[in-house]
Amino acid sequence: IATLDNLIGDRLLVHIITGGVDADQRRDGDFLGHDERYRRTDEYLEVMRRVWINDGPFDFDGEFYRVQKAQSEVSSAQSPHVPLWFGGISEAAIPVGAKHCDTYALFGEPLGHVRELMTRLNAEAAKYQRELKYNLSFRPIIADTEDAAWEKARAILEGVKAESSPH
């Protein structure tokens, strides 16, 4: 990633996705549970950021990763490293994202909920002397008329319900 960052001229960011539904993860060969995956992500980001910053060789001995004299010959072009984006609002996700990410990605939920999340995330980031940026993602449903848009919305909701129900 640091090499790509140098090649494309400081336009790279990395969005960290820890995973989704356990069944989907197992399909990809990842049999860790939800909270374990976030502990692994925390370790991975700790190691990756230290390699990118490249202050010299370091050792790391964690639950999931162990490195000795880790170092890269290539540092990130961006300082201190490639910007990290992160998403996830579970109890396991919030501390990891607040500790490591530069921009926290949230969905455009009711504004009160977004405000509560941002307050909590800011408090968590402050524990690490960090300030977060935010990306708020909205998914507009557009149609020729308001009634047609609501019809599309109901169809999307029914599709989600059908996909998420046990078969």
Model-derived features with residue positions:
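Active-site-adjacent structural elements that line small-molecule/cofactor binding pockets in enzymes
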Residues: I1-H167
